[in-house]
Design a protein with these regions (language model features):
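Multi-pass membrane proteins that catalyze or facilitate reactions on polyprenyl-/lipid-phosphate substrates
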Residues: 1-152
């Protein structure tokens, strides 16, 4: 992989990470468009890009993260502890679905040739587009707070 390709892929990752689209999917598409061999760099390169994204997110949101961490160690139950608990609660369905579907998805991806993976990524991006369209036209809910049920 050439340096310019790595820079372009980093820009794609940075631009798409905070949009309601799949940054990993766009990364795969960008690799294909740039003619980058998926095996070159592979998982290490993708992990490096995502680690850089996490680091930049921590830098940007440092004051909020610091407030939550300090609030976690309060002796009395407070808003920060409730918020962190809701974040953890919101991860439970994703973990369950992820661990349940992981063997199936792993075998699916391993059996697909490169163009098949690209087709899968494209299909998932279309599914995301449909879900975002439904969310856009759905009746908005105006809630001041997130309940534990909403978090789950």
């Amino acid at each position: 992989m050439e340096t310019i390709q790595a820079i372009i892929l980093g820009i794609v990752q940075g631009l798409t990470e905070f949009l309601p689209v799949s940054s990993s999917g766009h990364l795969q598409l960008a690799k294909e468009l740039l003619g980058v061999d998926p095996e070159v760099g592979g998982l290490t390169f993708d992990l490096t890009l995502h680690a850089a994204t996490v680091l930049s997110t921590i830098v940007v949101l440092w004051s909020e993260i610091k407030r939550l961490v300090v609030g976690l160690f309060s002796k009395r139950f407070n808003a920060e502890q409730a918020y962190v608990l809701k974040i953890i609660l919101s991860m439970i369905p994703v973990v369950i679905v992820g661990f349940t579907l992981e063997p199936f998805l792993q075998s699916l991806v391993e059996d697909l040739p490169n163009h098949g993976i690209l087709l899968l990524v494209g299909t998932m991006l279309l599914v995301t587009a449909v879900l975002l369209t439904f969310a856009y036209y759905a009746k908005p809910r105006h809630k001041a707070t997130i309940s534990y049920r909403d978090a789950f």
